[in-house]
């Protein structure tokens, strides 16, 4: 079977044929670094890491570009509220995202561009759009530059919308739009905000412009796959596609979108107060178990978080792991160069069917345990080799250097219980307004590498890695 993926633009599963034989160019909308990542953010990273690994297994050289949005309204708002420079917010949260990706075993990108390093490319893209009649400079002297959505006949094709039914673009203080649906390419300088010079006046880039400029710089005017969360289809990806194609670029040939991580049926987000940070979860389960949890559903499906489903995923992974470790001990070292079974490959070839692929893996565990019970060590070893190959493709190989010796979930539980007791004592001290004791407890925890953050929902703690 050839590789097939669901393409958002055509709304059908299509055979995948790369632009260049043997090479796949892949762009993923990465972090907007106004806050540390929650597990919903990282689900997208895990989904496309599995895609990348499968493409590599199939023999493709993958050029993977994952951007960093290091300047936007939210970052500026956080910086203002904290009384710090905007780049301090960006850098702090960029490091948190990088650590989260690494913790969950995501391969590093081929290139990871930051928006503020690509202002010249953005200016050139705006110039092309203005020259072609698809963008205009605001007439009020503000320095704003907007994309004229009525000038581009295909606007709305990615998100399957009709222009006349669209709502106004959410650009905040839109000062001189010709049409309320037009979106900002460039935001003219405002007092106290960072700005960069352009032929149309100083300012800073709009979110959509950033991604188009970075994607085409590193992957070319036409590339294979553009990925991201389904919540980005409109307006972000619609606007990316429109401005790039209107400028004369072919842009993405396939659009792949992962489903959302929800909790109680609602999208997980910091604004709703229902987000869970990576360190919170990895105190309950190991990082590899969290990776299994985030990657187990089909990438296009929503995944509703619950403590029960997290525990079930951890137990499911442990069944795979325990069999491999047992075979490795009984039958000798398991090789890491065995092909995956055909039914596993067929599942991933068909729009990255991870649930079906995992079913094949778990069937191997059942067969392997039966072989061990019968004393058939050679057959068990063969099954173990195939299982290891499957888990390696999914980034879950328990015998790999990434995950070997990571069985410390029990220790996490103990540490969590002990820290919770100490934090209860600190909360009691705060209630008594004994702030000296509360501060001393916090400082003592900090000396042990445990950082405490007081939130409206109560204290949170994080184990700082040295």
From Swiss-Prot:
Binds 1 zinc ion per subunit. GO terms for biological process: cysteinyl-tRNA aminoacylation. Its cofactor is Zn(2+). GO terms for molecular function: ATP binding; cysteine-tRNA ligase activity; zinc ion binding. Pfam families: CysS_C, DALR_2, tRNA-synt_1e. CDD domains: CysRS_core (cd00672). NCBIfam families: cysS (TIGR00435). Belongs to the class-I aminoacyl-tRNA synthetase family. PANTHER family: CYSTEINE--TRNA LIGASE, CYSTEINYL-TRNA SYNTHETASE. This is Cysteine--tRNA ligase.
């Amino acid at each position: 079977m050839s590789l097939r993926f669901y393409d958002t633009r055509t709304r059908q599963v299509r055979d995948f044929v790369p632009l260049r034989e043997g090479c796949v160019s892949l762009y993923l909308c990465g972090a907007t670094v106004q806050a540390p990542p929650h597990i919903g953010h990282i689900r997208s990273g895990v989904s496309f890491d599995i895609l990348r690994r499968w493409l590599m297994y199939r023999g493709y050289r993958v050029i993977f570009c994952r951007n960093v949005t290091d300047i936007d309204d939210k970052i500026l708002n956080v910086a203002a509220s904290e009384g710090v420079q905007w780049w301090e917010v960006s850098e702090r949260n960029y490091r948190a995202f990088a650590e989260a990706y690494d913790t969950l075993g995501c391969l590093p990108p081929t290139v990871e561009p930051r928006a503020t390093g690509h202002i010249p490319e953005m200016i050139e893209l705006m110039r092309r759009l203005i020259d072609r009649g698809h963008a205009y400079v605001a007439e009020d002297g503000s320095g704003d530059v907007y994309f004229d959505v009525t000038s581009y006949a295909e606007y709305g094709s990615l998100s399957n919308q009709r222009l006349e039914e669209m709502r106004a673009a959410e650009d905040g203080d839109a000062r001189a739009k010709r049409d309320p649906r037009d979106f900002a390419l460039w935001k003219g300088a405002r007092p106290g905000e960072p700005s960069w010079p352009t032929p149309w006046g100083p300012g800073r880039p709009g979110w959509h412009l950033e991604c188009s400029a970075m994607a085409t710089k590193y992957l070319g005017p036409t590339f294979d796959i553009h990925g991201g969360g389904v919540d980005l289809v409109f307006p972000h990806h619609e606007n990316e596609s429109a401005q790039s194609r209107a400028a004369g670029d072919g842009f993405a040939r396939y659009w792949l979108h992962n489903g959302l991580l929800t909790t109680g049926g609602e999208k997980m987000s910091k604004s709703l107060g229902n987000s869970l940070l990576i360190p919170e979860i990895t105190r309950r389960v190991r990082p590899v178990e969290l990776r299994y949890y985030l990657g187990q559903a089909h990438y296009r499906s929503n995944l509703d978080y619950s403590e029960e489903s997290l525990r079930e995923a951890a137990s499911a992974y442990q069944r795979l792991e325990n069999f491999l470790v047992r075979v490795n001990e009984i039958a000798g070292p398991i090789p890491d160069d065995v092909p995956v079974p055909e039914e596993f490959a067929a599942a991933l070839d068909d729009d990255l069917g991870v649930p079906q692929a995992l079913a094949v893996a778990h069937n191997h565990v059942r067969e392997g345990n039966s072989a061990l019970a019968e004393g058939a060590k050679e057959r068990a070893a063969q099954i173990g080799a195939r299982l290891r190959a499957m888990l390696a493709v999914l980034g879950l190989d328990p015998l790999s250097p990434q995950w070997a010796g990571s069985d410390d979930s029990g220790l996490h539980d103990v540490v969590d219980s002990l820290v919770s007791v100490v934090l209860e004592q600190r909360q009691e001290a705060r209630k008594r307004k004994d702030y000296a004791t509360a501060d001393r407890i916090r400082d003592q925890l900090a000396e042990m590498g445990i950082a405490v953050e007081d939130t409206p929902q109560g204290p949170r703690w994080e184990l700082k890695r040295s």
